[in-house]
Amino acid sequence: MMHSAEYRHTETWPYHISAGGVIYRHQQGQLEVVVLYRNRPNGRHYHLPKGTLHHDETLEDDARREVLEESGIRAEIKGYLGAFTDDFMKDGVHLNKTTHYFAMIPLENTGKHDAEHDGVEWLEFDEARKLLESSEPMKKEYIILDRLRDFLD
């Protein structure tokens, strides 16, 4: 049974639900997307903004909230890009995590990202895809960028 305000795994409820987004824009004829990064001893690790669904939220509400909290960008959802489900072990517990992603456009940049990340960058699409694939290949977020490109075509 789950007793948290979030859809976060527990020892007895091994499921985790998250949502996030790909914030995109066209600058000087180039498609750009937002990526977050954390500085690690072996270099920067890039990923897309996302976070855990709260019980009183829709997936869309979660995506908008997490994108704003993590990137500092208030964004509007333009479409659904699908989800990934991942099974893994954490602290000896088998977990199932599903993360939903949305295509989003920026409305306002507050300039305040969360303390969990070292930075937020707008990158040209191909560069962002390459960085997502090379720094966090197991997360497969580069595939979400491919879905964004298909969505926009």
Set out the residue ranges of the language-model regions.
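Conserved Nudix-box catalytic region and its N-terminal flanking loop in Nudix hydrolases
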Residues: 30-73
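Short, well-ordered beta-strand micro-motif
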Residues: 23, 37, 101-105, 124
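Active-site segment of metal-dependent pyrophosphate-handling enzymes
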Residues: 68, 72-109
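Nudix hydrolase/Nudix homology domain
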Residues: 43-46, 111-153
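Short helix-loop capping/hinge motifs at secondary-structure junctions, enriched
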Residues: 29-30, 109-112
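A generic structural motif
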Residues: 24-26, 38-39, 87-89
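Acidic, metal-coordinating catalytic segment for phosphate/diphosphate chemistry
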Residues: 1-28
